[in-house]
Amino acid sequence: MFCLVLCSQRVAVVPAHADEQQLQRQIDAMKRQLEAMQRELAQTRKQSAQPRAGAASGAPSQVVTARKGNEIIIPPPEPPPGASMPVKSLPSWFDGIHVSMAGSFIALDGAWRQRNEVSNGASDPPFANPGIPLQNTALWSEREFRLSAQQSRIALKVNGDIDPSQHLKAYYEMDFLGASTDANNRESNSFTPRIRQAYAQYDNDVYHLHAVAGQAWSLLTKNYYGMLPGTENALVTINAQYVPGFDWLRNPQVRFVYDWDKIAWFGLSIEQPATVFPGGVSAGTVSPPAPIITSINNTCTGASHLNGTTTCSNDIAPDIIEKAAFDPGWGHYEVFGLQRWFTDQVAISTIPNSWSQKTTFAWGVGGSLLLPVIPKVLELQGSVLYGDGVGRYMSSQLPDAVIGPNGSLTAITGLSFLVGAVAHPFEGNEIYTYYGEDRSDANSWKVGATQGGWGNPNFVNNGRVNQNLTGGTLGVFNTPIAGFTCTFDVQKAQEFTIGFWQDMYKGDAGRVRAGLQYGYVRLTAFPGVPTGTGTPNLGLHPNNNIAFFSIRYYPFN
């Protein structure tokens, strides 16, 4: 057909008086050109299928047809004998498979905090224990300085083509922010590798379909283009816990995506569930009134390859996320929906064998936008998440649910939003600033003398300020002195941060970047009531000033 089209076009420009011999000569010449093109294509395919054989015979570097069809990649030549430094050659091709370690880096991070969170370059979520310490503990007046290489990352990406329209991809990414029971920061500074991402992806260009299976950023996480893994618009902060208002998980999932000419994208993701409950210092864990008893989670076991020092929530169904994204040519826009199911066991202690399972439905909606106000120089962004039981998806890890008066779980309404700007004023420079908030609504109850829920106005909060000087309590997050109580249910977590990255070197040996970040974090607690001691509700707004620095070497970028 290709020949016929070309021939028909050629005939169209032949003058009417041209004789048949001249026309035949033109057709024969075109046939010879087509045959030469076919031989060249066959030779290219043969060379790409046998790259090692060509290298072993000393033949010139073979030409490999890249994934985008007419893109030609010529690998660099072999280094000369005795060369002191090998020529950088990653990403590479092996038997038609494209292998890249781009994204790997060696990091040295530092953190200074006005309040001691006992953390490194990845701050604890502000609501966590310890998180930001309260004024009733010695941690409040302690300064903190840490150095760490734990954010150093190993990344491996593999691409291959089934045929010109079907493609496979695998990606693995790990860092060292895990800590086993024998990890320490005193002598060996030994820490545990952990999975960040590990997934496989299938793409079909004809039907515009994509499928992902494995652990990746949640579909709920905002993207800068489309909605496939690798296009997430993650914050560029040094702090690995990012900023309140940034909604994210890295989660095991199965994702299906359809794209309409790469302009509109529609996706569905089935993801690993988990339920976040109030921390141990919170009265949100108060049990329902007798004789009702509940079981909201189970102890994880090492035999099941889970962390035996934590608990696993009772989950009966995956989290379901739907998302639509649009790339009309200027900016990127997203909307999404979320469905979740929380479950616990409820029994009446006076009735034998009365355990029964209760299920609570939760939901969320949200969206994001990315606006290239000055293309390649300045972009603005924003995102929002609202719903019942959405705390797990917030950077602050606010609770999803609490126990209700009848023993079943009741979802906590939450709101999260973020605004930010990223600028590239000159080559190799990136300046960023973000402001974000995570909020939770009160969800409380009182039955007789029993009170519970989240943000209950009857919870006692008179023990936030006075420091407990009792032995053994100095390094504990929340340590009210005897006769005082501090519930501290978090109503709001806020952060403003600003920072920059600067390329110090970029060339054949890779890339070296240095960065600085400053963040101001502030919590607001539900007030509760003082007791007969007359102590007012002080200490409702603990805060922290934090500074980070980082030096990172990317050998393959």
Where are these regions (language model features)?
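Outer-membrane beta-barrel translocator domains and adjoining extracellular loop/strand segments
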Residues: 116-120, 182-190, 224-231, 278-304, ...
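C-terminal segment of classical bacterial N-terminal signal peptides
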Residues: 4-15
